[in-house]
Amino acid sequence: MAVALPEVVEELLSEMAAAVRDSARIPDELLLSLEFVFGSSAIQALDLVDRESVTLISSPSGRRVYQVLGSSGKTYTCLASCHYCSCPAFSFSVLRKSDSLLCKHLLAIYLSQLLRNCQQLHVSDKQLTDLLMEDTRRIKGAAGTWTSKTEA
């Protein structure tokens, strides 16, 4: 079962995709709408797209993940199909506080898809598994570090 974005976001992204197909650009009014819905994350996501920071990693089995090089220089792994990002902002603002719909990395993925500005990397199934396992270990390590600091 796919996780759906709120209808207003789906509609906005659909209108933006249609504008890109028709004129190869996004009109200012749609960019203003994007900023209204996502706040400062919209500008930050567009900056990530402009810097070509989004990479789609795919394997022969059809598995797909995205990696986004964040503005801090860290790389975050994202699963667009279930709206997940490994960044701290996603965990805190999207999951815990529910005050954001998406983090800037996920928004950058959706924007790079519609602007056709996404890097492509094809890897073996084993390489993709290793990448995901490494990311999982990194997240667990960071969570363990965070937990031990808060318990002290």
UniProtKB/Swiss-Prot annotation:
Keyword list, A-Z: DNA damage, DNA recombination, DNA repair, Metal-binding, Nucleus, Zinc, Zinc-finger
Keyword Metal-binding: yes
Subcellular location: Nucleus
Entry keyword Zinc-finger: yes
GO molecular function, one term: zinc ion binding
Chain ranges of zinc fingers (SWIM-type): 76-114
Swiss-Prot/TrEMBL GO biological process terms: double-strand break repair via homologous recombination; protein stabilization
Entry GO CC: nucleus; Shu complex
UniProt function note: Involved in early stages of the homologous recombination repair (HRR) pathway of double-stranded DNA breaks arising during DNA replication or induced by DNA-damaging agents. Required for meiotic progression, hence for fertility.
Subunit (UniProt): Interacts with RAD51D and XRCC3; involved in homologous recombination repair. Interacts with SWSAP1; they form a functional complex involved in homologous recombination repair and stabilize each other.
Family listed: Belongs to the SWS1 family.
Name assigned to this protein: Zinc finger SWIM domain-containing protein 7
